Amino acid sequence: LVALLHDAGARLIVADVDKERAATCARNYDAKLVSAEEIYEVAADIFAPCALGAILNDQTIPRLNVEIVAGAANNQLSAERHALDLEARGILYAPDFILNAGGIICGGAYLLNETQHQLEQRITKIYDTLLEVFDLAKRCRITSATAAERYAESRLPIAMSVR
């Protein structure tokens, strides 16, 4: 993610519990380095948790100074109610299992013997899916996390029929 954002011209601030890895990343991508504890207070557009789960919790959410949480880490919310906490603070939450669906899509494409082009087409649809989830959340006045769960549940019959 850091490489993609760097190549797109984003200004980056990085942190990791592995201080050496964080320093290498900061050096390689001309990013500002902060500690894993400081990252929550950093004023930024996007907070992208990409490693540890359950990092969005009662202690960290009040410290966030961002507009969007969108990262690839699994199970970012410590509890379902934390989606409400993010919403109450005006922070848009991109549900992790929608954003990081590329891995499972890749596995499915492999099992179905799909081409690289077919795989890339599926992966680019993640963006559209995310927009659908945000729209569902807005229309139904629910959190994006709940909307993502409803969306996934609505897709299960289709997925099961592919077997």
Please annotate each region the language model reported.
Residues 1, 21-22, 57, 82, ...:
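Residues within well-ordered alpha-helices
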Residues 67-163:
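Adenosine-phosphate binding glycine-rich loop
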Residues 36-42, 53-69, 81:
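Rossmann-fold NAD(P) dinucleotide-binding segment
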Residues 1-46:
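Glycine-rich phosphate/diphosphate-binding loop of Rossmann-like nucleotide-binding domains
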Residues 3, 53, 60-62, 83, ...:
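Short glycine/threonine-rich loop-to-helix capping motif typified by GTGT followed
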